[in-house]
Regions:
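Catalytic machinery of carbohydrate-active enzymes
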Residues: 1-327
Length: 327
């Protein structure tokens, strides 16, 4: 059985498809191919459950022509937009997708009417694949490193399980932990802090934080690769993050996760996920204006950004200390 799984982007969304790849490979003895964007192929190419990766080309027709030569038995569309639908239809084989719940999300964002099911997106993937008769009881996520991968933590004065990661960035400003909150957290935490992120704005923000915190902070923003960042997370004593791709990568590792929610909401079903929900803490300020966006924006629509600025720093630090003591 030859199967094409489609998910174009982004970091977290692709990591969230990892249980699907395992179910197909281990139970259906399927030859699993994956269609994604070039920027994200490193998230898939080291996965032993994926035999071949195709990259989305500028012209969708070129992508389709390339894929047609494979003769797929099944397409599983986990992106479900116009381009992925066009690819799926053109391949003329069995097709499975899932309900993105966009109307319900729209109601929640625009009218604060929450009729979303209390289900994680991985649970919805499992339901969509019921027709294949798969055993989906193991819904744990996976992140795979390259063969013979090595990263020297000591080069950055980091010792395994003796530091906490803080993710300072995010795709949108309203999903990011503000500088003032990060500084308050670092001031109260006793452990060394490994700062993670990417992009020019994250770099500027990280420099400002580093200048105020001294040697306690190890600034890794824009200094290491995504794979290296994943390794730093895996070896940490825990991670403090907002709704980011690195949050989902952390879900694949046995470490405490502390997620601060900004404009988005865990009820969208995209929170940090483990089968037994161990050591996952969500911090969501109860505001009438939240969520204000499904994805995020450059500015708070009400100009107060209280969803982040009103986070209970003392509670977050207390929870970090309790999980650290338990290790």
């Amino acid at each position: 059985m030859k199967v094409l799984v489609i998910r174009f982007s982004s970091i977290g969304d692709i990591v969230l498809t990892s249980p699907v790849l395992r179910w197909l490979s281990t139970q259906k003895n399927a030859e699993v191919h994956y269609l994604t964007k070039q920027a994200y192929d490193s998230l898939v190419k080291h996965n032993p459950h994926v035999q071949k990766i195709y990259l989305l080309q500028d012209e969708i027709a070129d992508t389709i022509n390339e894929l047609k030569e494979e003769g797929y038995d099944l397409v599983i569309d986990l992106h479900k937009n116009l381009r992925s639908k066009k690819v799926s239809k053109a391949l003329n084989c069995e097709y499975i997708t899932f309900n993105k719940l966009n109307i319900r999300k729209w109601l929640f964002v625009n009218f604060k009417i929450n009729v979303l099911p209390k289900k994680h997106i991985i649970d919805r993937y499992a339901e969509a694949l019921d027709v294949l008769g798969l055993d989906t009881a193991d819904r744990s996520m996976e992140y795979h490193f390259p063969h013979q991968y090595a990263f020297d933590l000591t080069a950055y004065n980091l010792k395994p399980k003796h530091y906490i990661c803080i993710v300072i960035g995010g795709t949108y400003t309203t999903k990011q932990i503000p500088e003032s909150i990060i500084l308050s957290l670092i001031k109260r935490l006793k452990q060394p802090i490994a700062m993670l992120g990417g992009g020019k704005q994250d770099e500027i923000k990280a420099q400002k934080i580093s200048e105020q915190c001294g040697s306690q902070v190890i600034n890794l923003v824009n200094k290491i690769s995504l794979i290296d960042s994943a390794y730093v997370i895996q070896k940490s004593a825990g991670i403090i993050t907002s709704d980011t791709g690195l949050m989902h990568i952390a879900s694949a590792f046995d470490i405490p996760i502390h997620t601060l929610w900004g404009n988005t909401h865990p009820d969208f079903g995209m929170y940090a996920y483990r089968v037994h929900n161990t050591e996952i803490n969500n911090y969501n300020v109860n505001l009438k204006c939240q969520p204000c966006s499904k994805l995020g924006s450059d500015l708070c629509p009400r100009a107060h950004f209280s969803c982040m600025l009103n986070q209970n720093v003392e509670q977050i630090v207390k929870n970090c200390e309790s999980t650290d003591a338990a290790q």
